[in-house]
Each structure stands twice: as structure tokens, then as C-alpha cells.
Amino acid sequence: MKKTDVIIIGAGPVGLFAVHQLGIKGLKAVVIDNLDKAGGQCIELYPDKPIYDIPAVPECTGEELTKRLLEQIKPFKTELYLNERVEEVHPEKDNWIVKTNNKEEFIAPNIIIAGGVSSFEPRKISLKECEKLEGKSVFYAVRNK
């Protein structure tokens, strides 16, 4: 079981910014996300869409925002657990236990749920033939420009 100060569920912009703020205060965090990369919907669904509501940044794309946030948290050496779906959260004394679908277990006195509009997975085509082509010629998100 991995022990830390804070478990952050969600590696989107809010989860990544939380890492930064916690790091400034000297707190260690781990981040768990269902997706295969950090950035949440900003990077998964809208990497090229302009964002206009970030303080002190007149305009940036979802991809640029994600890159900036990842650069900003580098000094804190935060472990990102990607492709991990949280399956269980329960209290134990003064801590929280979090278990994932990949059998990872974490313990911390604090949890931040930064899931945005919630965890999401693509609606896959329900044809067995498509499963063989996933990641080759059938994609459910923008991977490369």
C-alpha cells in the first residue's frame, strides 16, 4: 500500500493544479486517472480547442494548458497512476484507503476528487471486428495531429 499526504482522483486541469498548490505547501500527492494520459477532457477530447477562461492567460489550447500544468508540477515529482480506475474508497481510522482496478492501493489522510464532469470512457463500437482494429485504424480520441 502506497502512503502519501493526499490522493487526487482525476488528472485533469483541476487535479494537476491541486498538485501544484499542495506541493507549495510541502504536501506530497499521488494522482489517479482512468485515462491513459494527464489532461482530462482538455487533452482527450479538445486538444486544439481554444480556452479563454484561465486567469492571466488570454488564450491557450487544451494541449498547451496540459503541457504547462505538467511542467509546473515537475519539481514535486508527483506519481501519476494513469489507466487506473478507482474502484473503492473507504475510511480507515484517520485515513482513506483507495483501491484501483489494477490492484493498486493507496492510503492518505486527505482525498481530492477532481473528476470534473466525472470519469468518462469512449462509447466503443459494439462489433467484435472493431476490437482488433482499436489503436491501429479505429480510434476514440485525438491521438496525433
Q: What residue ranges belong to the model's regions?
A:
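FAD-binding core/adjacent interface of flavoenzyme oxidoreductases
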Residues: 1-9, 25, 80-145
